[in-house]
Amino acid sequence: MKLYNTLTRQKEEFIPLKTGEVNMYVCGPTVYNFFHIGNGRTFIVFDTVRRYLEYKGYKVKFVQNFTDIDDKMIKRANDEGITVKELGERFIGEYYKDADSLNIERATVNPRATEFMEEIIQFVKELVDKGYAYEIDGDVYFHTKRFNEYGKLSGQNIEDLQAGARINVDERKKDAMDFAIWKKQKPGEPAWESPWGMGRPGWHIECSCMAHNLLGDTIDIHAGGHDLIFPHHENEIAQSECRTGKPFAKYWMHSAFLNIDNKKMSKSLNNFFTAREILEKYDADVVRLFMLSAHYRAQLNFSEELLQSAMSAVERLYNAIYNLENLANEVKRNDLNEEEKKYIKKLDEYREKYIEKMDDDFNTADAIAVIFDMIRDINSNVKSDSSKKIIEYALSIIRELGSPLGILQKSTEESVEDEIQQLIDRREKARTEKNWALADEIRDGLKERGILLEDTPQGVRWKRI
């Protein structure tokens, strides 16, 4: 099994530090708002990586943090007249709702920065004591020039970085690229007592500290969005390796951006959709299939057309499952003839192809293509005169290969009901916008499938006809 290591810029054989076990740290959200679907891509990608590692038999300790003290959080809490803690609690709850709706498995641990303040202060103190950090008037900065390998993750030269950083630089710093690991308290900000006075940690030190405390000096996989390579992950490496003298992570993985109109989707550009907005129209299988339809290191363009295409694809997959379930209930023969024994081996070959694709740097796009090839083959070859055993085997392998991707696990009835509700919601939106043609098209399409809509004072109801 190979994965692309951002640190070495090449695919490497995956060999965890401890046989059969994987320690994995993924940078999580700053909890001041709902997460947008661009963040959602990162969370889905590394949920899939975790699921596949577990499918391969690894015991995975998966840590994803919550940044619950941050400039953005302080500003929003002040704007709303609530505490930063109250804001964090609210959006941690909202994160779980949306992540659960996207079928993202809960992390082994979701640490919060504010729970590790004592450990963070000790981390900063050690860096100061070793001469890697310095204090100026209550602020503590990491001295990047003391770390000779600074820039190794992002492939940037420190001299070039410093030249670019000299605009609006804090004159008190020894070098332009030095970054804050402890910030002096400003009026109205939450703060903790430290050897340098009241203050709070910098963002980069929080992740380093939580990873160290929960996973050890060196972890197997550290992951996050592509935008975190520099400066966040670069700074994590610098402060962590200066503290321990050991490599911080063996493998670094980064997911590419989700774009909208060929620009990165982000809150700062105000060109984003929240995961919750998308989930009002599409269910988890659709969103996950869309997100995983491109390799995680390839940028993906967001569009309604692509989501509609993913919805049709998911419908085809569940239709295949539905047809097989009906066949399994109808057929009586249990024995396998020679042709069917050969066909089971053919289905096993699809599994092997799928594993081959996923073993090649988690190539979900090609793995999904294997599933569709297999479905087409099953649709052509598994019929009403087939053995019950082969029908059940076909069903089980479809579910099995969907599992690492987090799809195809619902009952067919659940899937059908979710899809009908999504179409009803789209019809209601069309009616609100006075798009009567689209509303009628959706109603007529459902009627052709044996679903009759009834508009009542209490809302739209549906029944089978």
Curated annotation (Swiss-Prot):
Name of the molecule in the record: Cysteine--tRNA ligase
GO cellular component terms, semicolon-separated: cytosol
Motif 'HIGH' region location, chain numbering: 29-39
Subunit structure: Monomer.
Organism taxonomic ancestry: Bacteria, Bacillati, Bacillota, Clostridia, Eubacteriales
Cofactor(s) required, per the database record: Zn(2+)
Reaction catalysed by this enzyme: tRNA(Cys) + L-cysteine + ATP = L-cysteinyl-tRNA(Cys) + AMP + diphosphate
Cofactor: how and how many bound: Binds 1 zinc ion per subunit.
Residues engaged in binding Zn(2+): 27, 207, 232, 236
Gene Ontology biological-process annotations: cysteinyl-tRNA aminoacylation
Name of one Pfam family that matches: CysS_C
Main location: cytoplasm
Keywords (A to Z) from UniProt: Aminoacyl-tRNA synthetase, ATP-binding, Cytoplasm, Ligase, Metal-binding, Nucleotide-binding, Protein biosynthesis, Zinc
Example of a GO MF term: zinc ion binding
Keyword Oxidoreductase on entry: no
Protein localization: Cytoplasm
Similarity comment: Belongs to the class-I aminoacyl-tRNA synthetase family.
Record EC number: 6.1.1.16
Residues reported to bind ATP: 267
Motif 'KMSKS' region, residue numbers: 264-268
Listed HAMAP family: Cys_tRNA_synth
Keyword NAD: no
UniProt organism field: Clostridium tetani (strain Massachusetts / E88)
